[in-house]
Amino acid sequence: MNGPALDTLLATHGPVLPVVLPLLAGALLLLLESARSQALQRWVPWVSATATFALLALAALLLRQASGGEVQAYLVGNWPAPFGISLALDRLGALMVLLTAAVACTALVYALGGMAARGLHFHALFQFQLMGLNGAFLTADLFNLFVFFEVLLAASYGLLLHGRGAGQRQRLQAAVHYVTFNLAGSSLFLIALGLLYGVTGTLNMADLAHKLPVLPPGDVRLAQVAALLLLTVFAVKAALLPLYFWLPDTYAAASAPVGALFAIMTKVGVYAVLRVTTLVFGAEVAAPFLSLLALATLALAAVGALAATRLRGLVAYLVVASAGTLLLAAGLGSEGTLAAGLFYLINSTLVAAAWFLLADRIAAARGGSDLLQPRPLGGGWALPGAAFCVAAVAVAGVPPLAGFMGKALLLQAAGPLPMGPWVVAGVLASSLAVMVALARAGSVIFWKSAQVGAAAPDASPAHATALAGVLAAVLALAAAAGPISAYTGAAAGQLLQRQGYIDAVLGARPAPAAWDVRKEMRERGDAK
């Protein structure tokens, strides 16, 4: 496809392509994985890899398109908002889609090292989860946010259980807790949507932004209840205290590539909080409690990391700590804290994905155990040892990597605010606790395990490529901190200036078509 044709395609159908591509790939992979022909089944990894890397290229093009500042709305089925399904691409949505694609490529390459073959329909579930994630980041109405949540959750249930042998019982127990929590969250989500639709007659986020400020006094309380229910649901997804207890066991039980992909899952909840508080309800709906709960989440995650007895459990608490930091930035609500939070979001997602892969490689080098106890080291631990140092520096917020830059930007922006001293103390204390936890883990794994055991299998090319690739992305983020922080600053400004998003969604007009079903329905009505 030549340049002008590609530009036309992106300008016309850009927001829907990240949803359609994994949907079609997942459907095709489901057929191929179910085929009896071995020749057809051999195509499965090639189709999955092609679709995932094509998504990465598409996401990069969409980011370039969104960087200009224009919000692009897409009317599914050509029905105008707020009556039809609307998708919208802005700077934040484009960033999240690109980050999802980058993590997906890393996880898939690692899975191609052998883990994808340990269960049924891995590749199809993987693509359907990408569809749900991208749809959640691009939808412009709350009901379809619910739909995409259910799609990604249904796929994640299967991915969590994926795998055979060691850890299967642990995965099953974690899956029961995970499903129970998320089913309860889905029920609350539906109740909140019913309340909102009952008082406003719409679930389109741009339309809600218009209608909520002019509600009759009798309906305001119902809308506030709906807002709190929605924030509760998103707090479950984002692992905010006291609703984060499902996450450590779930993420620790997942296989390495699934855990790496799950690194973006908590960010869906953070994204939803950002979107509804800046666009629909206003920051004041969460201001009384979000920052305080985020600080408490950060504190307990640091304690959990210090108390962890397994490396995968430690990594899971690092994910909770990053979610607390991001929600702290969202709760403070200024443009500076939001910009810093978005920059930190990129680093924390990439580093979390790296840690899940790294924990698996370290366990392999130690005979399959991730217990933080001295054990004989097998061969093949040079790559995990070097990667451990880079990942530890990145996640703890130590110079010169991007974790330090993100936290420094957050502290700089939060300093003048009323909660500034608490934010500074909480972030610095949690960073110190994470450094201590990682130093303890590193000393146990690499220094106290001086005895050399039987040689462990070397990392496969796929495993080494995936781990090196994601760590290279972490290093590149630090090297390109200037332009990336400029982009996240622009994305934060666009979030707070919501009128552009509202105008783009409600002002989108259906494209002319040769056959218009609405016109035909009107003509039939006139004829009668």
Model-predicted regions and their roles:
Residues 1-17, 24-126, 206-210, 494, ...:
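Transmembrane helix-loop-helix hairpins at membrane boundaries of multipass inner-membrane proteins
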Residues 2-9, 88, 134-142, 200, ...:
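Helix-coil boundary and interhelical linker segments in multi-pass alpha-helical membrane proteins
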Residues 11-21, 89-101, 143-155, 221-236, ...:
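Structural signature of hydrophobic alpha-helical transmembrane segments
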Residues 32, 40, 44, 122-218, ...:
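Alpha-helical multi-pass transmembrane bundles of energy-transducing inner-membrane proteins
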Residues 138, 189-201, 265-279, 325-341, ...:
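Hydrophobic alpha-helical transmembrane segments in multi-pass integral membrane proteins
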Residues 174, 224-292, 316:
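Short helix-boundary/re-entrant hairpin motifs in multi-pass inner-membrane proteins
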Residues 241, 345-368, 421-457:
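Predominantly late transmembrane helices and immediately cytosolic-facing juxtamembrane segments
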Residues 371-372, 377-386, 438-528:
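Cytoplasmic/organellar membrane-interface segments at the starts of transmembrane helices
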